[in-house]
């Protein structure tokens, strides 16, 4: 959901700074939704980077595609895909953005986290905003190690 209030208190750039994405990175945004973070993330990684904005809902994919076109971004690929089967190459992603995506009944962690682990590069980062009990589940999975928390974003390194 996009609103002036959300931008004021939790703007996309502030959240993205917490994820520490860098120019030139390949970033996967899971559950891009309305594209609240998409344009800012693409701008932060620059022309040498690549952002894969993924959502399972075609309405969101269409909406984000229009935002990307309007912003004239060439470094974004918007895809309609289930995040438990991304279709991405193994170890191809520097950072996965999971902003208010989990928990979800359509993304059981025992199936979802292994796919995120598979696509992340060996030193890749999983950047998450969610509830504390979900963060504990990520730690307990053994697939990711907690490294930092900044601007409400918990960052995990691929184990």
Where in this protein do the model-derived segments appear?
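A short SAM/SAH-binding and catalytic strip from SAM-dependent methyltransferases
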Residues: 94-108
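Conserved SAM/SAH-binding beta-strand->alpha-helix loop
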Residues: 57
């Amino acid at each position: 959901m996009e609103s002036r209030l959300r931008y004021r208190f939790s703007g996309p750039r502030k959240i993205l700074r917490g994820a520490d994405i860098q120019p030139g990175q390949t970033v996967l945004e899971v559950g891009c939704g309305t594209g609240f973070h998409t344009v800012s993330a693409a701008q932060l990684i620059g022309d040498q980077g690549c952002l894969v904005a993924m959502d399972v809902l075609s309405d969101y994919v269409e909406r984000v595609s229009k935002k990307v076109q309007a912003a004239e971004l060439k470094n974004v690929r918007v895809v309609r895909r289930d995040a438990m089967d991304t279709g991405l190459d193994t170890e191809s992603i520097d950072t996965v953005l999971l902003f208010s995506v989990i928990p979800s009944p359509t993304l059981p962690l025992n199936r979802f986290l292994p796919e995120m682990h598979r696509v992340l590069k060996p030193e890749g980062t999983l950047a998450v905003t969610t509830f504390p009990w979900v963060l504990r589940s990520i730690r307990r999975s053994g697939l990711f190690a907690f490294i930092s928390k900044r601007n409400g974003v918990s960052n995990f390194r691929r184990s």
